[in-house]
Amino acid sequence: MVIFMKKLSVKSFLLLSVSLAAVILNSCTNSKKLFVAEDLTAENLFTVNIEGPAFDKNGQLYVVNYQHDGTIGKVAPDGTCSLFIELPEGSVANCIQFDSKGNMFLPDFTGHNILHVDMLTEKVSVFCHEPLMYSPNDLCMNSKGQLFASDPDWKREIGQLWRIDTDGKPVLIETNMGTTNGIELSPDEKTLYVNESVQLNVWKYDVDEKGNISGKKLFYKFDDFGLDGMKCDKNGNLYITRWGKGTIVVLSPEGKFIREISLKGKKCSNLVFGGDKGKTVFVTLQDRKGMEKFENNIPGKKY
C-alpha cells in the first residue's frame, strides 16, 4: 500500500478520494432509513375497522374494510387502493390469512364464522361456523394448514382460543382468558403467542405436532395503552402493535425488550412483513383509516 501511494501523484490521489467519497455518499443517499414510518396510503380510504393486512403468494397486499365494513380491499405498492370483494351481508372480517395454496381465510366476528375465499372465482363460503365463538378476531396458521384464532368478548372482557383443523372442525383449546386479540406462531411453530388487549398481558404456549397447546407462561406484561396484532420476524422476535400509543414494540424470543418503533398514527391495529426482501413492515392505522410502512433490519418469518 505504501509503494502504491508513492506512485500516485497528488492530483490523482485527490481525484481518487473525491470519487470514493461520492460513491459512499450516493450509497447512503439511496439506502432507506430503518424504523422510520412513512405513509403508504392516503388517509380515510378505509373504515375505523381497518385491520388484518396480508400478502398473497404473488405479493399482492389485501386489507379488510375498504371504504365500508364488510369488504376486502387491495393495496398497490404505490399506495393506491381498490375493492377486491364484498362479503355476504352482515359479515365483517377482522383479519386475513392465506394458506400455502393461496386460499384466503377470514374471521367473521359478527357471524361467528371463519370464511373461505376462492381467489380465482372470488366466491365466499363458510369454512367453519361455531355458535360458541364470541367474536373471532385474529388468525395465524401453521405449515399444516391449521388455523389458530383469538376470540374475545369485549363487553365482558374475557376471551378464549380456538384451533380450526383443515377439515373446518373447530377445537376449543383455551378458556377463561382476558380479551384475547393478537395471535402468532414462532418460526419453528413450537410456540404460540397470544395477547390480551385490556389486561395488557402477552402469553406463550408450547405447541405440539398435533396443534395442541400447553405450558401457559406470561411472556411480557405492559403497563398502559392497548395491544393488538402481532407478527414474528425470521429470528423469532415478536412485533406487537401498541394500540393508542402509536408504536410497535419488538421483543426477543426470551421476552427481552429490543426496541420501540414510533408511527405517525396512534391506533395501530395490525402489521405484516413484505417487500422484495421481506424487510418492509406494513401497518394498519385505525385513527388515520389508512396504512403506513417502515423498513426493518430483519425479514419476516416467511422470508
Annotate each PLM feature.
Residues 63-85:
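Beta-propeller domains
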Residues 4-14:
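Bacterial N-terminal signal peptides that target proteins for export
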Residues 71-73, 113-115, 160-162, 201-203, ...:
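A short loop-to-beta-strand structural motif that recurs across blades of beta-propeller domains
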Residues 39, 82-86, 125-129, 171-175, ...:
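Beta-propeller fold detector
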Residues 44-60, 88-108, 113, 130-160, ...:
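Beta-rich, blade/repeat-based domains predominating
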Residues 26-27:
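C-terminal motif of bacterial Sec signal peptides marking the signal peptidase cleavage site
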Residues 30-47, 216:
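A short helix->beta-strand "capping" segment at the edge of beta-propeller domains
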Residues 75-80, 118-122, 164-168, 206-211, ...:
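Short loop/turn segments that connect beta-strands within beta-propeller blades
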